[in-house]
Structures are given as C-alpha cells and as structure tokens.
A protein has these predicted regions:
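C-terminal transmembrane-helix exit sites in multi-pass transporters
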Residues: 110-132, 270-289
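Hydrophobic/small/kink-forming positions within alpha-helical transmembrane segments
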Residues: 22-27, 57, 81, 85-89, ...
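Membrane-interface interhelical linkers
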Residues: 1-20, 53-79, 195-236, 243-255, ...
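Hydrophobic/aromatic residues within transmembrane alpha-helices
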Residues: 35, 44, 94, 100, ...
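Hydrophobic transmembrane alpha-helices of multi-pass small-molecule transport proteins
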Residues: 129-146, 162, 287-306
Length: 312
C-alpha cells in the first residue's frame, strides 16, 4: 500500500460511514415499501427520483458550479442510469409483494454477479477459490427460492434480476470512475432513471393492461393519483435519506480501501431484517436465514480473497 493511500485509509471511519449508510438505505426502502401499498410504484419512484435529482443538482452546483453537470463520457453515464432503472425498479417491485428481509437476502448476490461479470466482461482472472464461492452462493439462492416446490413464489426471484443489473454498474464504474466526479455520476444516473420512469409510465397509461396479468406486474398499470400531504412528506424524507446514504457510502469508499468497506455492506441484511420485523411484523424463515448467511459468507470470502491477492 502506497504512503498516500495509507495516509488516507481510515478503516474505522469508513466502516461507520458504510454501516450507517446501509441503515439509511434500509429505512428508505421500508418507506418506499410502505408508500407502494397506497400509491402506484412508478408514481412513488418518480416523485422520489425528482426530489433526489433536485438535491444532487443543488449540492453539485453549490460545491462545484455548472461544470459538475458536464460528463466526460455521457454514454456510459446514461447506460449506468438505464441499469439503475432496471435494478431498483425491479427491486422495489419485489418489495411491494415480499418481506424486506427475503428481498435483501437474494439481492445480496450482487457481489457474486460482480465477480462473474469481471471474468466475462473485463477478462479479469478469477481463481478456483472465488469460482467456488460464486457457485456456493448461487446454490444458497436456489435453496432460498425453492424453485419447483410449493414454497416457490415467482416474485421472490425478482431481486435476483435486480442484483444482476446492479452488478453491471461497478463494471461501468471501473471504466469511468477515474474521469467522472461522483456527483456527476449521480446526477446523470438519476436523470436517466427519472426519464425512463416517466417514459414507462406514459406508455403504460396509453396501453390497456393485459388480461390475467401477474398480480405483481399489475401494480405497474395502476392509475396515478395525488399524494396526501403526510405521504408527500414521507416521500421527501425518503429522498433526503437516500441522498444522505448515497453520500455516506461514497465517503466510506473515499476514506477506506474497498476490501475493508465492502464486507460491511452486508449489514443491510441485518438492518432489513430488523426493520421488517419492527415495522411490518415480518419474521424470516429458516431457508432465508441459512441461505442469506451463506450468500454473505461467500461474498465476504471473495472480497477477502481479492485483498489477499492485492487486487483491490
């Protein structure tokens, strides 16, 4: 480790920023889950994204001026927003139907997908130890989902697609992270995300809902209606919390090395389980607990293995 990195590396502070940021994300997700029971999901996400975009632009202009709005590589930045749209919209779609802890446990496969995509897309060398961790992790997901059995719920598999889309974002970050400011990336991503929500909602409102549509997808075809003042306040609070959590996780990776911070991202599963129990009365089943622990263990092993090989 170089002297400059050593001076910047503040592991305890980085871990604290990460853990509290993930708590913020978990609380925000519970707010979105609550709002989606009373309003169409796309309407909830549209309002939240508009507020987040406004906050990011305001902070960016205040700290850096108009130059923060100019991206050096607009196409990868827009692709990042498209992936975020599919990742987060599908995740919140699942949250509207399944417990927070169940969705989080499957979503924790994202680091496994990152390892897989690093080998396939970036042609990075992945050794037998990490391939083994990936295989064990996805086996744990199969145990959690129980496909082919009476316990299987199709909507429970949606976070797996969400994790795959989200895992592509770090791949793009590795390509553009050295040339783009974090706020620029956030602004472009949120703007693209918001634009796609508006476009999708417009198309859905022009096309009649198909008959016998899956109940989970049927929620996308609900007609929009105005928020009450208290719920608008809840949406604003969720947006502020999301923005703070985003800044927190960015700060965590800025002041501590990746291999120190990444394992603590799994604290989201703990927060999600606790919040799901306290606010929704959800108690995770044995399959979710065992499978979730296996996925977390495999993800942490991959990170520690990469650190040992001096890859991060």
């Amino acid at each position: 480790m170089s002297d400059s990195i050593q001076r910047q590396h503040r592991p305890v502070a980085g871990i604290l920023f990460c853990v509290f940021a993930l708590l913020g994300f978990a609380i925000q997700d519970s707010m979105i889950k609550s709002l989606s029971t009373r309003y169409p999901l796309l309407e909830v996400l549209c309002i939240r994204s508009a507020i987040v975009l406004g906050l990011l632009v305001l902070v960016g202009l205040s700290l850096h001026g108009p130059k923060i709005l100019r991206g050096n590589q607009p196409r990868p930045l827009m692709l990042r927003g498209i992936l975020a749209f599919f990742a987060f919209t599908s995740y919140y779609l699942a949250l509207s139907r399944i417990p927070l802890a169940d969705a989080a446990a499957v979503y924790m496969t994202a680091p496994l997908f990152v390892t897989l995509l690093s080998a396939v897309v970036l042609r990075e060398r992945v050794g037998i130890h990490r391939w083994g961790a990936v295989i064990v992790g996805f086996t744990a997901v199969i145990i959690m989902l129980a496909p082919g059995s009476a316990l299987f719920r199709p909507e429970a598999a949606i976070p797996l697609f969400s994790a795959l889309c989200y895992a592509m974002i770090p791949i793009i970050n590795r390509r553009i992270g050295m040339t783009e400011h974090a706020l620029t990336m956030g602004i472009y991503t949120t703007f693209t995300y918001l634009s796609l929500i508006v476009l999708t909602a417009t198309i859905i409102h022009l096309v009649p809902a198909p008959q016998n549509l899956n109940q989970t997808l049927a929620g996308l075809f609900q007609r929009w209606h105005g928020f009450t003042v208290p719920d608008l306040g809840l949406a604003f609070a969720a947006s502020c919390l999301f923005s703070l959590a985003l800044l927190g996780i960015t700060q965590a990776y800025r002041i501590a090395i990746v291999s120190t911070v990444t394992p603590f991202e799994y604290s989201y599963l703990v927060w999600a389980t606790l919040i799901g129990f306290l606010f929704f009365g959800d108690i995770p089943g044995l399959r979710t607990v065992i499978g979730g622990l296996a996925v977390v263990t495999c993800g942490c092993y991959i990170v520690l293995r990469e650190r040992r090989l001096s890859r991060v």
